[in-house]
A protein has these predicted regions:
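Rossmann-fold dinucleotide-binding core
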Residues: 4, 9, 99-132
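Short amphipathic alpha-helical segments, especially helix-boundary/capping motifs
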Residues: 10-14, 82-87, 124-126
Length: 132
């Protein structure tokens, strides 16, 4: 079973995480909004106390955040960021589904590559209906 960490459970991320849990994956989730986490738990996800706990030791980490600054702040150490790439083992995969600027995606991708982590910039389309 793939261990998945999922950060960002809004209108798009929440249904995506729920689909992964329903497919039988162990999905640890985190969001700043407790009600979003509660919905994910009801769908079979496992709550993490913070973003680092959600991704630590995972084979696959997925983020779905509002803007490039949030994605950089999550994965990188620049400007006091959380540096969550450091919580992943070499060989792990990060998929960022946020619709962000190219510079942010490249910055995270380059940092991931330097640590032996695969990065996929995968902005989503289809809206909330497609995510469900």
């Amino acid at each position: 079973m793939t261990r998945i960490g999922f950060i960002g459970l809004g209108n798009m991320g929440g249904p995506m995480a729920a689909n992964l849990a329903r497919a039988g994956h162990a999905v640890r989730v985190f969001d700043l909004m407790p009600e979003s986490v509660a919905k994910a738990i009801a769908a079979g996800c496992i709550a993490a106390g913070d973003a680092r706990e959600a991704v630590t030791g995972c084979d696959l980490a997925i983020s779905m955040l509002p803007a490039g600054e949030h994605v950089r702040g999550l994965w990188l150490s620049e400007g006091g960021g959380q540096d969550l790439l450091g919580a992943l083992p070499a060989g792990a995969q990060v998929i960022d589904c946020s619709t962000i600027d190219v510079a942010s995606a490249r910055a995270v991708g380059d940092a991931a590559k330097a640590r032996g982590i695969r990065f996929l910039d995968a902005p989503v389309s289809g809206g909330v209906t497609g995510a469900a």
